[in-house]
């Protein structure tokens, strides 16, 4: 973890709104290990602590938050629960905006509750609105919104400075945007893992309707990303949450997951960008599906897969990476790290189409093991 390597706690970096601690952490990492590409603020919420406190999410815990709920060096933790209840499907599809405002938003955060009170039913007049927006709660919410905007503007300015520093050091940052499979959005944001699986049997029509209504806007969002300055050739990142082996059978996977993931991948390609597909969890049974894309255009990053099989199936179709278990970097010895790195290189390097990457982030790992990994790839991985 670059932050820990630089001597900072995760909490310190999350609450440093200048992003100077994050920048120093990244610069130290790049100077010490010289990887092939740079890093940005990533997904560790660097500099976002004060904004998170204002937003008050109910489904998230982060290092340094009031009450010290989790360890100062823990990555963020998410609490999954349904925001769309069993008896709300009709309301959800009839008026998604209203449902999102009055049902989902308060379940995710209390931040906008004063605003929601002003929007609920009854006769509207200038005087009634004036009374509602003059309450202490509403005024406090407005002040929080203004402060949140100030913090966000500062964050964006500092993030741009950080990226500029990385570029000037000679390291490209490839990521341009993001996308999501509709079923993942349904499961992650509305129903939760267990209920979304049950819904494949108990609420089949509702799942299908949500997916079909969501795929169009997702494809349009990708087209808009492709029109942004400098987008050509950049990565559009997608983390696949619910496509893992065993979560759903092959028939369900193809119908509710792969069909729309495939559409998104091809739309990213049409937009002259690169689909960066991070396959979370074990992905051995999904490899045949992953071959059904335009050859030479897709990058698959695996958390856990049989790389021999992945290489044999995808070698002429996509670039592959990952499946180096970071537990080895945390608990193993340098010699074990070197042996595993060599094994992966022997399997995946022949013929190209392989980028050496770990299966997940470098969190709480031994520095000597990271050094052993980088040295082995440089020495043993030469073509």
Predicted regions and their residues:
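Catalytic cores of TIM-barrel enzymes
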Residues: 1-383
């Amino acid at each position: 973890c670059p932050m820990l390597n630089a001597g900072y706690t995760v909490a310190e970096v999350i609450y440093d709104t200048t992003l100077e601690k994050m920048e120093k952490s990244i610069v130290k990492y790049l100077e010490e290990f010289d990887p092939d590409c740079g890093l940005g603020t990533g997904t560790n919420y660097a500099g976002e602590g004060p904004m998170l406190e204002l937003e008050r999410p109910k489904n998230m815990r982060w290092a340094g938050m009031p009450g010290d709920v989790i360890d100062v060096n823990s990555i963020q933790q998410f609490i999954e629960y349904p925001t769309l209840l069993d008896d709300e499907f009709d309301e959800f599809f009839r008026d998604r905006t209203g449902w999102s405002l009055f049902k989902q938003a308060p379940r995710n955060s209390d931040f906008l509750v004063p605003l929601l009170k002003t929007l609920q039913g009854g006769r509207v007049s200038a005087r009634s609105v004036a009374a509602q927006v003059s309450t202490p709660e509403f005024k406090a919410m407005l002040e929080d919104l203004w402060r949140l905007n100030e913090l966000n503007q500062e964050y964006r300015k500092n993030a741009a400075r950080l990226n500029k520093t990385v570029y000037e050091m000679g390291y490209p940052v490839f990521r341009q945007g993001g996308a999501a499979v509709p079923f993942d959005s349904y499961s992650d944001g509305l129903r939760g893992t267990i209920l979304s699986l049950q819904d494949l049997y108990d609420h089949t029509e509702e799942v299908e309707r949500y997916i079909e209504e969501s795929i169009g806007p997702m494809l349009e969002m990708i087209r808009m990303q492709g029109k942004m300055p400098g987008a050509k050739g950049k990565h559009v990142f997608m983390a696949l949450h619910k496509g893992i082996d065993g979560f759903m059978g092959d028939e369900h996977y193809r119908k509710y997951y792969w069909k729309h993931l495939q559409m998104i991948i091809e739309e990213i390609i049409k937009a002259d960008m690169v689909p960066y597909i991070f396959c979370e969890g074990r992905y051995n049974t999904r490899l045949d599906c992953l071959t059904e894309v335009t050859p030479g255009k897709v990058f698959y990053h695996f958390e856990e897969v049989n790389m021999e099989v992945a290489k044999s199936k995808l070698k002429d179709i996509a670039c592959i990476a990952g499946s180096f278990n970071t537990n080895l970097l945390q608990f193993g010895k340098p010699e074990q790290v070197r042996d595993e790195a060599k094994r992966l290189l022997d399997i995946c390097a022949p013929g190209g189409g392989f980028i050496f990457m770990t299966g997940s982030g470098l969190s709480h790992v031994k520095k000597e093991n990271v050094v052993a990994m980088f040295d082995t790839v440089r020495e043993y991985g030469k073509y």
